[in-house]
Structure formats: C-alpha cells, structure tokens
C-alpha cells in the first residue's frame, strides 16, 4: 500500500523533509494519489477513519495539506478549509495547527468569503491566542508563528466592528458593534501590551 511505501522509505519526518530529486517526485505523486483516494472514498474524514484503523502516522499532515490544495485548485473552497480544520481538530496540539488554521483563513480571504474569514479569525484567537491552553503549552518558535497572525486578526476584527458601529443607523446595532470593537481593542492591548499602537 501507499502508506507502507512511505513507512518504508520515509520512516520519520526528517527523511521526509530531506527527500529530493526523483525521490521527492515519487513522494509527491504518492501523496497526490492518496489524497485523491481519500476524496473518492468520501472526503477529508476518511483520512482519520483510515488511520484510526491502521495506526496514526506522522505524515498525515502532508495528506491533509495535499487534499486541501486539490480542493482549492478545483475552487471547492469550503472543502479545502474543512480539510485543514479536520487536521487541527485531529491534532489540536500539533506545532503545525496554527499554520494550518492560518491557511484556512487565507483561503477564505482569497476566495472572497469575508464573513467566514472573520468567523475563523475569531476561532483562531480563541484557540491559539495569548494565554490559551495551546499558547501556554508551546514554546517561543510556535508562539512567534501565532503572533505574526494574531495582531492582524484582532486589529481587523476591531476595526471592522468599529467601522460598522459608526455607519449603522440603528442605536442598538451601534451600541453592540462599538462594544464588540472595544472588546477586540482590549484583547489587542492584553495580547500586545508593549506594542507602540497599544496606547
């Protein structure tokens, strides 16, 4: 099977990352075919189903990424995002989880889904933000990866709510939106107390 082939030739992530030339070509072809097969069997959920039965593999992250890319190329944007979300849900403590979630948000941004983009920015902040269980259990390298996106996401949500609050005619909507904006500004200051724009 394809799984056994990767097991044999790429026993760990180091050997997988070091693949080049013809070896890399074979690896990429194998991952592409595996992603197609899982899609044929149903969708992204088939990856977890298969490896729950046959044993978890360190390289599952590559299959999720490949399947997500295939969906995106076909303009199945929500399926692409769901595949990345499935990886994060399956491996919530993985060092790659924030990176995959950032890809999900970026995909919605490029595809023109502003509401979904904002919704998932909120989820990202809640899931990976400063002080979250994920944040507390990961080191500086992973935190840096999170921080790169975190400031942009919080600021975007704050300015969106602020702008909407200023434009709306309804007093109730105005109050709600401005309260939301204030909440996001507070979150920004809490997360980045030393930032020059936090005062």
Model regions and ranges:
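Acidic, polar-rich low-complexity tracts and alpha-helical solenoid repeat scaffolds
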Residues: 1-199
């Amino acid at each position: 099977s394809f799984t056994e082939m990767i097991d044999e030739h790429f026993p760990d992530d180091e050997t997988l990352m070091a693949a080049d030339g013809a070896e890399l070509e074979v690896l990429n072809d194998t991952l592409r075919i595996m992603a197609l097969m899982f899609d044929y069997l149903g969708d992204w959920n088939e990856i977890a189903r298969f490896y729950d039965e046959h044993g978890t593999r360190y390289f599952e992250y590559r299959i999720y990424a490949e399947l997500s890319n295939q969906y995106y190329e076909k303009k199945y944007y929500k399926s692409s995002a769901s595949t990345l979300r499935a990886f994060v849900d399956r491996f919530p403590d993985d060092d790659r989880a924030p990176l995959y979630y950032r890809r999900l948000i970026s995909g919605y941004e490029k595809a023109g889904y502003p509401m979904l983009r904002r919704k998932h920015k909120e989820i990202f902040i809640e899931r990976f933000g400063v002080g979250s269980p994920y944040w507390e259990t990961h080191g500086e390298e992973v935190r840096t990866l999170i921080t790169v996106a975190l400031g942009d996401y919080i600021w975007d949500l704050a300015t969106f709510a602020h702008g909407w609050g200023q434009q709306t005619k309804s007093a109730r909507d105005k109050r709600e939106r401005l309260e939301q904006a204030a909440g996001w500004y507070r979150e920004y200051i809490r997360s980045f107390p030393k930032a020059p724009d936090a005062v």
